[in-house]
A protein has these predicted regions:
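Copper-binding active sites and cupredoxin-like electron-transfer domains
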Residues: 2-464
Length: 464
C-alpha cells in the first residue's frame, strides 16, 4: 500500500471551454477545479471524505480515488484524458491512454443524491467523450459523440453535470473511436454510495476493472485492432505478480466490486470462502435473491459486487478461472514440446528468431525455473508467462491473479501487505514416503530423417 502524495497543478482559468449540454451558472464558469494526477501504480489508501456528505470509501486495487471540491453544494471533479505510461508489473511498462496520469483512470466516489459536475479536458491526439456506463443521466449527458453531444476536440474542455440518482457501482469510458480508445486503456470506475451510511455496511470495500491488451513481446503500445487474441489479461491494467493483495482482518465483512471492459466473459473465483453476489449493474440484489457461490461469471460491460465473511485466515487465491487468463504474454502460440529433449535447441532457434519462447520439455512450469530461464533471455519490456514466488516456491501464475490476505489483529485502516501467512503446525500439505516404482515415460519414436518442425514468433495468444 503506497501513501505517496499526488501532484497538484494550479487552477486553470475557464477560457475557451466547450459545454457538454445544459445551461450552467456563472459561478461554475469562473474556474475549473485543479488537475490532480498520480503516476503511482500501487494501491492508495481510501480517500476519506472531508467535505460533502459522509460515506465509507472504497479501496481501488492498484489505483486511487479522485479528489473533488464543493462549489455551492455541487461536487466538482476534473478528469484529463491523456497518454500515460503504466507499469503492468515490475519489468514491463505499457504506453496507454488514460485519465489523470493512469490507466484505468481514478475512481470517482459520490453519494446518492449528490449533484455532480465533471470537467473533462482532452489532451489526446484525437477527439473523445465520456459515457457514464449504467447511470441514469439526462440524455445530453450520456457521452455518445454525435448522438448526444459534440465531440471533445483535442485541447478542449467539456463539462458534464447531473444528479447521482442511484447507489451502485458503475464505469466510465469513451463513446468516441471506442475500439481504439478502450483498447488503449481509457476507462475508470464510479461509485455512488448509499445516502444512508448504514445501508449494507462492510468493513473493507475493494473495486477494480477487468481489462485486456495485446502487446507484442519487446514492444510498448497495444495493438488496437485485436478482436479476441489478447495476451495480457489484467486487473486494473496490472498483471500478476504486479497486482497488490487485498488485505483484510479476520471476520471482516468484505465487498469486492469488479467491472468487465474486456472483449470476453470472466468467471471470477475466490478460494477458501463462499460469497454472495450482492450487487449488479442494475442495483443491489435483494437478500432473498442471493445464494452461496465460489465463482461468478461477469460478462462484457457488466459489473458484480460480491460479499463474504473473512473467517478463514490465510493467503487465498483470487483469479479468473479461464486458465489462459492467468498467464502473461510469453509462450502463446508456440509448438507443444512435452517430452521433447531440447538441450541447445532454444539457443539455436533464438539466434534465428530472437523473440522465440518455447514450452518446456516437462511443461510450462519450467518457465518459472530460473535455471531454465537462463537459457531463455526475455525480449525487452516483457515478463515471463507465469511468474511470482511464494514462501514455498514459484506460484506459476500470471495475468488475472492476486490474493486475499486474511489476518488476525489488523488495525481498521491497515492495508499493508502482511507478508506470507504463518500456517499453524500440521496444516500444510507435505511429502510422504512411498515405495511406488518410478513412472516410466513412453519413448518417442523419431521418424527417419528427423521430425519436421516450424518456428513462429509469438504474436498474441489463442482465442479465449
Amino acid at each position: 500500500m503506497d501513501t505517496s502524495k499526488f501532484s497538484r497543478r494550479d487552477f486553470i482559468k475557464f477560457a475557451g471551454v466547450g459545454i457538454a449540454a445544459s445551461t450552467v451558472s456563472k459561478v461554475a464558469m469562473a474556474a475549473i477545479p485543479e488537475i490532480v494526477t498520480t503516476e503511482q501504480s500501487t494501491t492508495q489508501l481510501p480517500l476519506q471524505p472531508s467535505t460533502g456528505r459522509p460515506y465509507n470509501p472504497v479501496v481501488t486495487l492498484n489505483g486511487w480515488s479522485l479528489p473533488w471540491r464543493m462549489n455551492n453544494g455541487i461536487k466538482e471533479f476534473h478528469l484529463v484524458a491523456e497518454p500515460v505510461v503504466r507499469e503492468m508489473a515490475p519489468g514491463m511498462k505499457a504506453h496507454l491512454w488514460g485519465y489523470n496520469g493512469q490507466s484505468p483512470g481514478p475512481t470517482i466516489e459520490v453519494v446518492e443524491g449528490d449533484r455532480v459536475r465533471i470537467f473533462v479536458t482532452n489532451r489526446l491526439p484525437e477527439q473523445t467523450s465520456i459515457h457514464w456506463h449504467g447511470q441514469p443521466v439526462p440524455n445530453g449527458m450520456d457521452g455518445v459523440t454525435g448522438l448526444t453531444q459534440p465531440a471533445i476536440k483535442p485541447g478542449k474542455t467539456f463539462m458534464y453535470e447531473f444528479d447521482a440518482k442511484r447507489a451502485g457501482t458503475f464505469m466510465y469510458h469513451p463513446h468516441a473511436d471506442e475500439m481504439v480508445q478502450m483498447a488503449m486503456g481509457m476507462m475508470g470506475t464510479w461509485i455512488t454510495h448509499p445516502k444512508n451510511i448504514k445501508f449494507m455496511p462492510v468493513d473493507r470495500d475493494f473495486v477494480f476493472l477487468l481489462n485486456a491488451y495485446d502487446i507484442d513481446p519487446g514492444s510498448y503500445t497495444p495493438k488496437v485492432n485485436t478482436m479476441l487474441d489478447f495476451n495480457l489479461w489484467t486487473f486494473n491494467s496490472r498483471v500478476f505478480p504486479g497486482i497488490d493483495p487485498m488485505v483484510v482482518r479476520k471476520n471482516d465483512r468484505v465487498r469486492i466490486r469488479f467491472g468487465n471492459l474486456t472483449m470476453t466473459n470472466h468467471p471470477i473465483h475466490l478460494h477458501g470462502h463462499e460469497f454472495q453476489v450482492t450487487g449488479t449493474d442494475g442495483g443491489w440484489v435483494p437478500p432473498t435473491a442471493r445464494w452461496p457461490e465460489v465463482t461468478t461469471d461477469v460478462a462484457v460491460g457488466q459489473m458484480r459486487a460480491i460479499e463474504f465473511i473473512a473467517n478463514n485466515p490465510g493467503d487465498w487465491a483470487f483469479h479468473c478461472h479461464k486458465s489462459h487468463h492467468t498467464m502473461n504474454a510469453m509462450g502463446h502460440q508456440v509448438p507443444t514440446l512435452l517430452g521433447v529433449k531440447q538441450d541447445d535447441l532454444v539457443e539455436k532457434i533464438g539466434n534465428l528468431v530472437p523473440d522465440y519462447m518455447p514450452m518446456g520439455e516437462t511443461g510450462m512450469a519450467e518457465m518459472t525455473d530460473m535455471k531454465s530461464m537462463m537459457n531463455m533471455p526475455l525480449p525487452e519490456n516483457t515478463i515471463p508467462m507465469t511468474t511470482g514466488t511464494g514462501q514455498y516456491g514459484a506460484i506459476d501464475m500470471g495475468g488475472m491473479f492476486t490474493t486475499v490476505k486474511i489476518r488476525d489483529g489488523l488495525a481498521r485502516n491497515d492495508y499493508k501487505d502482511p507478508g506470507a501467512f504463518k500456517h499453524p503446525r500440521g496444516t500444510v500439505a507435505r511429502e510422504v514416503i512411498n515405495d511406488l516404482p518410478p513412472v516410466e515415460r513412453a519413448k518417442v519414436v523419431v521418424p527417419d530423417g528427423g521430425a519436421e518442425m516450424s518456428v513462429r514468433k509469438p504474436m498474441g495468444n489463442m482465442k479465449h
